[in-house]
């Protein structure tokens, strides 16, 4: 694992969280129970405090950072998709930030909201609960439906379960030289399917 103390501040990681060995946590970082942090995520707490509350996930290649005297927070069950950047912002409880989105300083994403993939949320934006935000710059398109929130929650549950599965079985290995006969397929833990347009 890549954990670094910075000016006496050491990352805090709950024993029931999972942090991929290639992720980097520096300084003032606090990770709660059941959190999943994916490969190559960078949490650079060398200025502001970075907080991932219980059940949140920060997927592959995500970046968290913020200015001094600010907290960048992903609240409980927050879901941060691959490649997203969070800088000095607050992500509400049970909200989703889509892949490769950018959330800027002082922005607040309301609880149970969804930020569509590739969106850019400007500094200082203050959202309400259950908003669907789309575009660059992101604009409120409509309210999040019950169906969309259910889909989001299934995906978040998958990552909470993945944290447990990774703690139990993920290990470094050497590749095989050929595909074995009857190679099994991995399965998730919920009935979630990719969202269609």
Swiss-Prot record:
The source's superkingdom equals Bacteria
One biological process term from GO is:
carnitine metabolic process
> Is ATP-binding tagged as a keyword?
no
The record ties this protein, via SUPFAM superfamilies, to: Trimeric LpxA-like enzymes
- GO molecular function annotation: transferase activity
**Keywords assigned:** Repeat, Transferase
Recorded coiled-coil stretches? none
Biological or metabolic pathway of the protein: Amine and polyamine metabolism; carnitine metabolism
Read off the Pfam families from this record. Answer: Hexapep
Its function, per the record, reads: Overproduction of CaiE stimulates the activity of CaiB and CaiD.
**Which protein family is it in?**
Belongs to the transferase hexapeptide repeat family.
- What's the name of the protein? Carnitine operon protein CaiE
